Each structure stands twice: as structure tokens, then as C-alpha cells.
Amino acid sequence: MVVETIERSCEGSKRRHVNGGDIAVPCSGEECSNGDINVAPGVSAKRARVSREMTFEDIYGADALLNDDDDEDDDCDWEPVQAPMEFVKWCCVNCTMSNPGDMVHCCICGEHKESGILRHGYLASPFFKDTGLIEVEEKYGGSSSATSSTAVGFDERMLLHSEFEVKAQPHPERPDRLRAIAASLATAGVFPGRCLPINAREITKQELQMVHTSEHVDAVDTTSQLLYSYFTSDTYANEYSARAARLAAGLCADLATDIFTGRVKNGFALVRPPGHHAGVRHAMGFCLHNNAAVAALVAQAAGAKKVLIVDWDVHHGNGTQEIFEQNKSVLYISLHRHEGGNFYPGTGAADEVGSNGGEGYCVNVPWSCGGVGDKDYIFAFQHVVLPIASAFSPDFVIISAGFDAARGDPLGCCDVTPAGYSRMTQMLGDLCGGKMLVILEGGYNLRSISASATAVIKVLLGENPENELPIATTPSVAGLQTVLDVLNIQLEFWPSLAISYSKLLSELEARLIENKKNQMKRKVVRVPTWWKWGRKKLLYNFLSARMISRSK
């Protein structure tokens, strides 16, 4: 792998943290002076006289009058009424979008410019400046002891992985993602508190080579010797990135072992950089090492014969699919925005089912448009994910939990809520006795990812998800069509889907007929042509009569 390196002097390159915004250069006294127009009394009287005596006919011959010697002197004394002002720009801590300095709330997501989201997560008010919010800490916080067997993997050294260059708009995959989730969990008393922490370790090169080539592992390690580098235009690394990636993979590996061997019931890997785009020999899409793939193979080394990976990140996990597309012992199911290959990374069509004996063990649910929400996801779970997963009968379940399909995410532009994520987690919890590892992938709206991650962990702790979503859901027409396309392809490998496919096909036909009828009802009723011409003739006769009467 070739690492693209950019040399740059260290001098003057340190970041300054000013609420994620640009630092404005203050205007000098001369630039910001509020100059008035100083005019001599005689000149003022002359201008007033010219103003009174000027007519439209005089305009064309007034050049000499307006450009005499006295007025040339006036031009020397002229100053602008007000000098141009430079506005300080600030970037929203929640969604990274830039805003004018005179605005208090983000014009995109409405977050306060001094929001307390990094201290309290989604529990902080988006509309007010952070003032401590002691009442929030008292309501949700506490010193509850860890009474469950849900483990959380987290290490602060992963926060050191960040983009070195100071840019006008922050990179969406930034350390604040983990800070916001950790703040939500701490304020709610979930972690630390009700969850078990596990010690972090750096994964070994031998473990990584179960997934990646030695050249790829060496390329990532090389970045620790560089001030900053890029694998692709959007996949950065600094001197701490390689260690952060090893810590993330090591936490996922140890959580997988502890869950499968029964030391803990389930777990959540609060890690970065994400991993599902990282393939056998390449890093891309913000990802360096494939954490989910490492966890799956470590679980198999611990005794799991069959592993299920469900990837609900809004982007297709092309790296995970590449690693396991020929492996019948790992079933990979991905639900992602696709749009016919026009949405990043462009892979993950429904007909990508695996190869070389692994056909049927790659299941892609590619949404054809943005805006997909809870109903479509849960519908796909009911008719695709759970039937195939039940037939596969896994020993261990991994969720590649990207929260960029969440409502308000700047990259995903979909509409899944925390209630939707918690419901999907609960639906998968009935498989293999609840042996489940949830691994953080994407998600770039801090308020959305912190609320969604907290909702998922509460389900792992045994809490019931919010009852806002009905068990039986009606998908959008686009969602129903996508599910039918997937079922039609996967029928060859999972015959038990035949009954569901026939039923849904009839439902789609009924929906299309109903939509056609509604469109016909909404058509505008057109008036007869003779009536329109009759009105015109009546108006013509009326106006003609009035004109004739006036001319007499």
C-alpha cells in the first residue's frame, strides 16, 4: 500500500481550540473607524442649490457643474460611512457546519454555539449555553455500581487520532464523536456505573494478519513516524493513529472473546477509527483496520462456528464484504443507502451475494434513495434479516453500528431514530442466547450518535426499547420494492423466503394500484373549452360597448 505523505513545517501548525471555529483577525483602528463626511459650509450650500435647481432636462448637460474644482477637493475629504466588518465564523460542535459569528444557534441543526453536548451528550439542551446542568446530572447520574454483565470497551488514547491540518471545516470523523457518546453514558449513569469496563490492549500484528496483508499492517504502522499522512483524500492519519487503530481492534477482539466464553453477556465497543471500509489490503473511508472482521475471526478462534455480522451503517461495508465474501461460516448482512451505486462507496448491490462457494452468505439491502427511516429498517429486519439469520443459526452476533443513518446526520441524510436502533438491537438479541457485540462505526451528528448509542446500550442492559414503534410497520413504496428485490435474489439460497416474497409481491401490486387511483383523484377538473371561450367573448363585448360609449 502506498501512503501519500505531505511534508510541512511544524512551526505555527498547532491547533487552537476555539469552539471548532475559525479565528478572525481583528480590524485595525483605521479599518474599523466610523468616518463621517466632513464638508465645508460653502460646498454644502452649493450642493443644496444644485439639488433644488436640477431638472430632468439639465441632467444631460450637468457634467461641468458636477465636476468642478471644488468637488474634486471634496473627494479628497470623503470617507466611507462604515468600513467593511469581518465576521468571526464558528463551526457547530454538533454537526461541524460553519456559521456567521453573529449567530448564536447553528443554522443547520439549531445547536447553541457554546453547547454543553461534549459534557452531557444528547441530554444537554441544544438551545442554551452550557451552565453546568446540575439538575441533569442529579436526575440521570449517580454512583450506581456495575450490576450487569454488559461490558464497554473504551480508551482515551483513541481521541489522539485526529486530522493534523487546521481546515475551515472540521473532518466529520473527529474525536468529539467519542466524547459526546461518553458524556451521554456518564450523565445517564450508564458508563461508568452500570456497565463493566475492560482493559484496553493493542492488538498484535499476528492477529491483524488474520484479516489484512502484512503490507497493509506495515503501511498503517508507518504513519506513526510521520507528522501526518493520507491513505485517501478523506482517510487521514497522524502520529497517534496507528496506536488508536490497534487499540480499537484489540478492544473488539477482547470483547468478542469475553462474550463468547461467557465472562460477560454482551458488549459495546466505543472505538475509533471505524473499520468496515478497510479491506484486505487497503484503508479507505476513514477506516484503517477492520474491527468487525477481527472480532469475528477471534470469536471463531475461541470456538464460534458461525458468526453473523449485521451492518446498519448508512454506507456499505465494502471492506467487510471483501474479507468474508468467500467464507460460508460468516454471514454478512448490510442495510445501506445505495442509489444504484451513486452513493459512497458504490458497492453493495442486491446481486452481490458472495463468490467461490460463499454465495448466499452476503446479503445486501440497498436503499434506492435517502430519507429511509424506522419503518423501512424494521420492515427489512422482519422480512430479510431475521428470517435469513434464523436459518443461518449463528453462535455469535456482531453489529457494525454506524449511526449515520440517524435523523440529522450530515452525510447519511436518512431518518432512523434512537427508538429504531434500540428496536433492531432487541430483535437481534434473541439470536444465539444474546451473545452480541456492538461495534461503533460511523455517525457524525453528535446529538444523534450519542442518543442512539445510549439507547442501544440500554437494550444490552436489559431495558425494553421505547414503545413508540409498532411491531407491524408499513414501509414506503421504495422500501418495499428494495426488500422485494433482495428476496427475489436471495430465494435461490434461502428457500424459506418464498412465502414472504409472494405475500409482499401482492402487497406491492395493491399499493401501486392504490397510488394510481389516488393520482387520478387528485387530477384537476378541467372546464369545457366552450365555457372558457364564452367568458372571453362576454368580456370582449362588455369592454367594446364601454369604449364606444366613451367615444360618443
UniProtKB/Swiss-Prot annotation:
Keywords: Chromatin regulator, Cytoplasm, Developmental protein, Growth regulation, Hydrolase, Metal-binding, Nucleus, Repressor, Transcription, Transcription regulation, Zinc, Zinc-finger
Reactions performed catalytically: N(6)-acetyl-L-lysyl-[histone] + H2O = L-lysyl-[histone] + acetate
UniProt key word Cytoplasm: yes
Active-site residue numbers: 277 (proton donor/acceptor)
Disulfides per UniProt: none
PROSITE patterns linked: ZF_RANBP2_1
Effect of residue 316 to A: Loss of enzymatic activity
Activity modulation: Inhibited by trichostatin A (TSA), a well-known histone deacetylase inhibitor.
Chaperone found in the keyword field: no
Tissue expression pattern: Expressed in stems, leaves, flowers, siliques and mature seeds.
GO aspect biological process, one term: positive regulation of abscisic acid-activated signaling pathway
Domain of life: Eukaryota
Cofactor: Zn(2+)
Enzyme Commission identifier(s): 3.5.1.98
Main subcellular localisation: nucleus
GO CC, alphabetical: cytoplasm; nucleus
Co-factor note (free text): Binds 1 zinc ion per subunit.
Annotated positions binding Zn(2+): 313, 315, 404
Ranges where the record places region Histone deacetylase: 149-462
Compartment(s) where it occurs, according to its Swiss-Prot or TrEMBL record: Nucleus; Cytoplasm
RanBP2-type zinc-finger residues: 86-115
Family note: Belongs to the histone deacetylase family. HD type 2 subfamily.
Subunit architecture: Interacts with PIF3 in the dark. Interacts with HY5. Interacts with MYB96. Forms homotetramers.
Biological role stated in the UniProt entry: Responsible for the deacetylation of lysine residues on the N-terminal part of the core histones (H2A, H2B, H3 and H4). Histone deacetylation gives a tag for epigenetic repression and plays an important role in transcriptional regulation, cell cycle progression and developmental events. Histone deacetylases act via the formation of large multiprotein complexes. Represses chlorophyll biosynthesis and photosynthesis in the dark. Is recruited by PIF3 to the promoters of chlorophyll biosynthetic and photosynthetic genes, and represses their transcription by histone deacetylation.
Protein name: Histone deacetylase 15
Organism: Arabidopsis thaliana
